[in-house]
UniProtKB/Swiss-Prot annotation:
Protein species of origin: Schistosoma haematobium
One Pfam family recorded for the sequence: GST_N
Entry-linked PANTHER family: GLUTATHIONE S-TRANSFERASE (PTHR11571), HEMATOPOIETIC PROSTAGLANDIN D SYNTHASE (PTHR11571:SF224)
Self-association state and partner proteins as the record states: Homodimer.
UniProt-reported outcome of changing Y10F: Loss of enzyme activity
Reported effect, R21Q: Reduces catalytic activity 120-fold
Name the record gives this protein: Glutathione S-transferase class-mu 28 kDa isozyme
Class of this enzyme: transferase
Keywords: Transferase
Length: 211
């Protein structure tokens, strides 16, 4: 992919594109971050394969274009290309396991989107008192089982990036929800940022968005 121009296309938010962005950042890969307004989306939609975002457009040195769609498929592709899916079959399994656990948590978050405010607050209360703590406990057990300081060993993997993206969404629902609880999750983030100065800078510089 050396010399290719990579464009990540999504709305002005973290959402389903953030794991892709963070994978490229952690790998030290330059990319163009194109953010589309909801107002402009109807006219841009026909130009995107499948008419869904996020999408990645890769243009090689000869001008040949390759499109990639489906957020986790893209993130996995980029992570594998840059050796961020574990170094052994056992590590690969643990990476995928944690991605699955994080996605279970993400599904709870997505229940709150595009809802009227009163209904949204009701759903937030239900999930924060229901499945979210259970899923966070499961994730903490996986982090405890790691053989290193990060999600799977001591090298940054896609599991680390998917996890912190989802944890940020939990914090979006209630900024105090994680305070004083789930020490493994707090320690994981601390270790991850210490392990990847590029990622730490990206997160420090990242503008606040509603999703």
């Amino acid at each position: 992919m050396t010399g290719d121009h990579i464009k990540v296309i999504y709305f002005n938010g973290r959402g389903r594109a953030e794991s892709i962005r963070m994978t490229l950042v952690a790998a030290g890969v330059n990319y163009e971050d194109e953010r589309i307004s909801f107002q402009d989306w109807p006219k841009i939609k026909p130009t995107i394969p499948g008419g869904r975002l996020p999408a990645v457009k890769i243009t090689d040195n000869h001008g040949h274009v390759k499109w990639m769609v489906e957020s986790l498929a893209i993130a996995r592709y980029m992570a594998k290309k840059h050796h961020m899916m574990g170094g052994t079959e056992e590590e690969y399994y643990n990476v995928e396991k944690l991605i699955g656990q994080a996605e279970d948590l993400e599904h709870e978050y997505y229940k709150t989107l595009m809802k009227p405010e009163e209904e949204k607050q009701k759903i937030i209360k239900e999930i924060l008192n229901g499945k979210v703590p259970v899923l966070l406990d499961i994730i903490c057990e996986s982090l405890k089982a790691s053989t290193g300081k990060l999600a799977v060993g001591d090298k940054v993997t896609l599991a680390d990036l998917v996890l912190i993206a989802v944890i940020d969404h939990v914090t979006d629902l209630d900024k105090e929800f994680l305070t004083g609880k789930y020490p493994e999750i707090h320690k994981h983030r601390e270790n991850l940022l210490a392990s990847s100065p590029r990622l730490a800078k990206y997160l420090s510089d990242r503008a606040a968005t509603p999703f």
